[in-house]
Regions:
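Generic beta-sheet signal
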Residues: 2-4, 70, 95-99, 127
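Activity-critical C-terminal alpha-helical subdomain
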Residues: 100-174, 178
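Charged phosphate-binding loop/patch that engages nucleotide di/tri-phosphates or the phosphate backbone
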Residues: 174-211
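Well-ordered, non-membrane alpha-helical segments in soluble/globular domains
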Residues: 24-32, 74-86, 107-118
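Domain-level signal for Mg2+-assisted phosphodiester chemistry and nucleotide/NA-binding surfaces
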Residues: 1-77
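Acidic beta-strand-to-loop metal/phosphate-binding motif
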Residues: 6-8, 93-106
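Acidic carboxylate-rich catalytic motifs and surrounding loops in phosphoryl-/glycosyl-chemistry enzymes
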Residues: 44-57, 131-134, 177-189
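Structural alpha-beta junctions
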Residues: 31-46, 92, 117-131
Length: 211
């Protein structure tokens, strides 16, 4: 079994904690991540979650002026969050840490470098940046209609509205349960969205490292 820790933008992408049961309720991007990992290697996966605000409040643990300066100049906050997530993963012996952030097509490379810079500063090898372009709904649309996936990142239509329209045409509910079902059934090998394929490729590298 491998254990992941994930953090994202909001409750509708990575997931949320059930306050009463104190358990993690996976969102569509977590379900999609499990789907991708199992595409490369079948194994049991346990997911842990920390929301954005909790991660922001988590203390920096690097000591020494030079290391603090290195963290500070790595990025616009994304590097700090990636660093903190890596620290949490290491402290709890989680094998993989995944930080998700939406990005425009022009922002993708800089945000990717910031996140990976944070993981590298923490010397954590299995950190992965999940960066849907322009937002997580684009990946779900790509799973729903793989033929549209190659051009989805250049589409100027609101992704949330587009996903809702596509689900209405299929007489499917526009809710988290449906999104998770789409993610779980996604034909990983058919999706051509560049940001999706980068995520898939990075997860494949992690699988090869672990096994």
């Amino acid at each position: 079994m491998i254990e992941l820790i994930l953090s994202g933008e909001g409750n509708s992408d990575i997931g949320e904690k059930d306050i009463q049961l104190q358990s993690f309720i996976p969102g569509p991007i977590t379900v999609l991540t499990i789907n991708i990992l199992n595409y490369f290697h079948k194994f049991d996966i346990k997911c842990h979650f920390i929301n954005r605000m909790q991660l922001k409040k988590y203390p920096m643990t690097l000591k020494g002026k030079k290391k603090r300066e290195k963290i500070k100049t790595t990025g616009k906050g994304h590097a700090n969050l990636a660093y903190k997530l890596a620290c949490i993963a290491r402290e709890n012996n989680y094998q993989v840490a995944i930080l998700m952030r939406d990005a425009s097509k022009n922002e993708f490379q800089s945000i990717y470098q910031e996140i990976m810079g944070g993981f590298e500063t923490a010397m954590y090898k299995n950190g992965v940046a999940a960066i849907p372009v322009p937002e997580s709904e684009a990946w779900l649309i790509s799973c729903l209609d793989p033929n549209e996936s190659k051009s989805i990142e250049g589409c100027k239509t609101d992704m949330k509205k587009l996903l809702e329209q596509k689900l209405l045409k299929r007489n499917q509910a526009h809710n988290k349960e449906t999104w998770c079902e789409i993610a779980g059934k996604c034909a990983i090998e058919k999706v051509e969205a560049p940001s999706f394929n980068k995520y898939r490729s990075d997860l494949e590298k992690v699988v090869k490292y672990l096994f």
